[in-house]
């Protein structure tokens, strides 16, 4: 559609699809605004900056991704019918996906506040918006005056029938064994995030290399847009470093700081570093000129941080020795305990060095699944992994609330474990795994993966294979790359990469890579993945010593499950008016009941006895009448020809007046009274029509043989009816007045057939 606004547009063909980058139509007062479109999916990304009154000591970047429900022609399901409240889990994860590749690319020393907003304003439910938002953020920053050293582009890699697909459609993703989001610059990959179905390391590397080449047109398009509308970048004046103070700090601290950084224990090392800082400050404050510097404490802290980085990295590169004394490939000591929580369905305590995670698995019913409102409609999740990082895990005091980091780590661990879970209806339970970080000194999310796998096996969940994960680090100096296995928290902070890789012995199930340098060659990634495989196999071997396979039975405290198939016509009866019947079953048994339109009823109960009771109560509403069986029913209607008796829920039988008693009955109401119980025998089933007899029951009670072939004939001699004289003009009425060949009073009497 041709715009009447003065817009500038460029495009690139990537993965066989045109991706449009446009600016000038919307949000022109933003410092940078780009409309990114692929098919019918459109994301508007804006970038704005403003100076701060004082230096915060860090770069204040905020990224928020939002999905507007109108984009898919939907109205929000909230009470106020608008997008309010906290972001959804997906919105949080995509916000992180945008943040991670762009954050390292801001010019060093730039400390102004920056806000990136990505709003999905059109969604065709075919082309995913997340990778468009990554590219849009880079484009908005690139054309803005914000000092950003991009561009980068984002794309998703799929693999269908062994062939790589770039930016696959949502339909293609259903058949893909790979789903990796990559962000890359002209020269190298800067971010990786995704999941795989037991894919080998070499395939992952090949996918990254292939995708890096394929997304280059998006880099070209952004450079073209910069040429057309790009603004001059803001000048960044890096803070002037006090060389004299830096030299003095190094002189005072180097020896003792190096010794402190050789202490293996995290908290002892932290205390020693703190003591070094205090000693240095004490010596410096003795100088009256320095004592007047209000920022001395922060400046010294920054200088000591830089010195720590130099000392640690130099020792690793020159000596091959890390902070805790390990070489570059050794995994920290592993300790595992399974089943330590007596009433939990499954539990495991996984410890790797000073990182420890208590992971608990819980089985629930299908009604416990998570239902989410999204652009593609209502989405249901039957597996959830929640990662918690309480402040006590690192000896700190903080507000205890779920952070974006916790959501991101939980999502990564969830991706890692999902491929090994039962994929069919044979395992109908909802699963929730909670990873409580007890201690943290690096790689706590991968501890959640290992502990999560063990807790599921402890619960008896039939996973196809154990899963383990490890975090890899990197030291890069003067073109030399050194990969570190199982990094510590300090190595994460002082190093150049955090590359988390999880999988089974067969292959990879989840990856996540963040770097602090401008890019990473794929051959270095290949080396890191090969080294990670060695570590993963070692960890899996340690896990197998404690729990080699899932327990043969589910936890006795897990819900008991049964499936019942009922006639779909009785579903409304099982539910009852206003849910009366199903609520009664739930109240009596404590069971959770899920009924499908097909007639499949899933029962989840706290005990086996409760499950059986719930099953019987459900089946009670789906009973079929049996010929010759006695039933105690309620009289629902009294008619001229007899009574209607409800012998089973919503199943009624006609008791003809001739079958109400062993003696002649003149009026049905003499025997049958509305709402009273009546015991009857089913004597005929003809499709949906059922006939029953009270007389047959009475005869059986008297020990008199009842002849089902003569259901209308009363027992005993007929009553003396006296001389009734000539009835005149009515002819032969076909035998016995009480039935005989008349077929009972239900025959054709010229009143519309059977009068049931």
Curated annotation (Swiss-Prot):
One of its GO terms (cellular component) is cytosol. It comes from Nitratidesulfovibrio vulgaris (strain DSM 19637 / Miyazaki F). Keywords: Cytoplasm, Magnesium, Metal-binding, Nucleotidyltransferase, RNA-binding, Transferase. One of its GO terms (biological process) is mRNA catabolic process. Transmembrane segments: none annotated. Residues 559-618 form the KH domain. GO terms for molecular function: 3'-5'-RNA exonuclease activity; magnesium ion binding; polyribonucleotide nucleotidyltransferase activity; RNA binding. Its cofactor is Mg(2+). This is Polyribonucleotide nucleotidyltransferase. The gene is pnp. Mg(2+) binds at residues 492, 498. Its EC number is 2.7.7.8. It is an enzyme of class 2 (transferase). It comes from the Bacteria. InterPro entries: ExoRNase_PH_dom1, ExoRNase_PH_dom2, ExoRNase_PH_dom2_sf, KH_dom, KH_dom_type_1, KH_dom_type_1_sf, NA-bd_OB-fold, PNPase. Its main location: cytoplasm. The lineage of its organism: Bacteria, Pseudomonadati, Thermodesulfobacteriota, Desulfovibrionia, Desulfovibrionales.
